[in-house]
Amino acid sequence: MLQPKRTKFRKMHKGRNRGLAQGTDVSFGSFGLKAVGRGRLTARQIEAARRAMTRAVKRQGKIWIRVFPDKPITEKPLAVRMGKGKGNVEYWVALIQPGKVLYEMDGVPEELAREAFKLAAAKLPIKTTFVTKTVM
């Protein structure tokens, strides 16, 4: 599972997920999976989508993960009263804005890439679309 090796602070404020995305172009591979919606991806969701893609292409070609879960999400245990401090870090998320390229792929035919990204998109909680590299 993806998570930072070390952070300056253990816990983070909730914050807001507004603004425009960086990393909107396919830069490593030939095909990409781009976010259309806004939301957050957990490390488990990122890994589940990666596994689905890897199995779909039968481990040929190359896959790049363009998102990293760097925001800790805390939860208080069940049946615990409010107060007494912030809860423990339970999982890590990556904040996603529309237009962000989540995954890239190269070394496979376009039809196979489309099928793999379709399987991966089913594992994710946000709407996505298939994109190809544009040559200028």
Swiss-Prot record:
Organism: Escherichia coli (strain K12)
UniProt KW keywords: Hydroxylation, Methylation, Ribonucleoprotein, Ribosomal protein, RNA-binding, rRNA-binding, tRNA-binding
Summary of subunit composition and partner proteins: Part of the 50S ribosomal subunit. Cross-links to the A and P site tRNAs. Interacts with assembly factor DarP(YjgA).
Family recorded in the similarity comment: Belongs to the universal ribosomal protein uL16 family.
Single Gene Ontology MF annotation: rRNA binding
Positions of post-translational N-methylmethionine modification: M1
Gene that this polypeptide is encoded by: rplP
GO biological process, one term: ribosomal large subunit assembly
PANTHER family reported in the protein's UniProt record: 50S/60S RIBOSOMAL PROTEIN L16, LARGE RIBOSOMAL SUBUNIT PROTEIN UL16M
Tagged with keyword tRNA-binding: yes
Role of this protein: Binds directly to 23S ribosomal RNA and is located at the A site of the peptidyltransferase center. It contacts the A and P site tRNAs. One of the last ribosomal proteins to be assembled in the 50S subunit. The simultaneous presence of uL16 and bL36 probably triggers ObgE's GTPase activity and eventual dissociation from the mature 50S ribosmal subunit. It has an essential role in subunit assembly.
HAMAP family in the cross-refs: Ribosomal_uL16
Modified residues ((3R)-3-hydroxyarginine): R81
Post-translational modification: Is hydroxylated on Arg-81 by RoxA. The modification is nearly suppressed when E.coli is grown in anoxia.
Superkingdom: Bacteria
NCBIfam families per the UniProt record, alphabetical: rplP_bact
GO cellular component, one term: cytoplasm
Name of this protein: Large ribosomal subunit protein uL16
Pfam families: Ribosomal_L16
